[in-house]
Amino acid sequence: MNQNLLSQYGTPVERVEKGLQALREGRGILVTDNESRENEGDLIFSAEKLSDEQMAMMIRECSGIVCLCLTDEKTEQLGLPMMVESNSSRYQTGFTVTIEAAEGVTTGVSAADRVTTVKAAIADGAKPADLHRPGHVFPLRAREGGVLEREGHTEATVDMMTLAGLNPCGVLCELTNPDGTMARLPEIVEFGQKHDMPVLTVDDIINYRIQLAKKAS
């Protein structure tokens, strides 16, 4: 990871805190993982504050596979089974079956329809009947231990929402270049500068959580 590119966002702790503040303000953040892992950056928004414009940005600027990161508890509440019984994906990404809001959508694929689906899923009293399956939103089940258990964007998203004091659910999508290739750190930082979004790493969140745990002990 090129720390020189990230240094403009401060120390690892400062990067996390800037990210938390951005989420509280309803802005997006960009989270990168290790070069030895996926070596990608995800555009992440709070699910509870998500707007149609932000969803449109994710569809336009990212891979198009917009994912809704959920806690174990929320996944169980919604009765969402995993997409496959035996997960053979390289990083054990926790995809459940895809979803669509049962009411308030047309084809389900527009930015507004996908936001409606997200809001239906994260509602406090949401129940399985509120969602149809399959759909155009891809839920991801986060590991209970967060980034301390799995160093993934799913867990990073839920951890950041929790640390920010928001509904723990968030949406993410992998940032891509105009030619369809995956954005790497230089492009991720450039995108962050253009759209006033903090850039941080999964490692930053891991270290932040470890420091918080030490202070609490």
UniProtKB/Swiss-Prot annotation:
Which residues bind Mg(2+) 2 per the record? Answer: E38, H153
The record ties this protein, via InterPro entries, to: DHBP_synth_RibB-like_a/b_dom, DHBP_synthase_RibB
Q: Which GO terms describe its molecular function?
A: 3,4-dihydroxy-2-butanone-4-phosphate synthase activity; magnesium ion binding; manganese ion binding
Where D-ribulose 5-phosphate binds, per the record, is at R37, E38, D42, R150, E151, G152, H153, T154, E174
* SUPFAM superfamilies from the UniProt entry: YrdC/RibB
Name the positions where Mg(2+) 1 binds. Answer: E38
Classify the source by domain of life.
Bacteria
Kindly state what the record says about how the cofactor is bound: Binds 2 divalent metal cations per subunit. Magnesium or manganese.
What does the record give as the reaction this protein catalyses?
A: D-ribulose 5-phosphate = (2S)-2-hydroxy-3-oxobutyl phosphate + formate + H(+)
UniProtKB keywords: Lyase, Magnesium, Manganese, Metal-binding, Riboflavin biosynthesis
**Would you name any one GO CC term?**
cytosol
Give the GO biological process terms: riboflavin biosynthetic process
**Pathway involvement of the protein, from the record:** Cofactor biosynthesis; riboflavin biosynthesis; 2-hydroxy-3-oxobutyl phosphate from D-ribulose 5-phosphate: step 1/1
Instruction: Reply yes or no: does the keyword Phosphoprotein apply.
Output: no
Positions of the site: Essential for catalytic activity? H136, E174
Q: Which cofactor does it need?
A: Mg(2+); Mn(2+)
- Write the Enzyme Commission number(s) for this entry: 4.1.99.12
Q: What does this protein do?
A: Catalyzes the conversion of D-ribulose 5-phosphate to formate and 3,4-dihydroxy-2-butanone 4-phosphate.
Q: How the protein assembles, per its UniProt entry?
A: Homodimer.
Give the UniProt family note: Belongs to the DHBP synthase family.
Quote the protein name from its UniProt record. 3,4-dihydroxy-2-butanone 4-phosphate synthase
List the gene name.
Answer: ribB
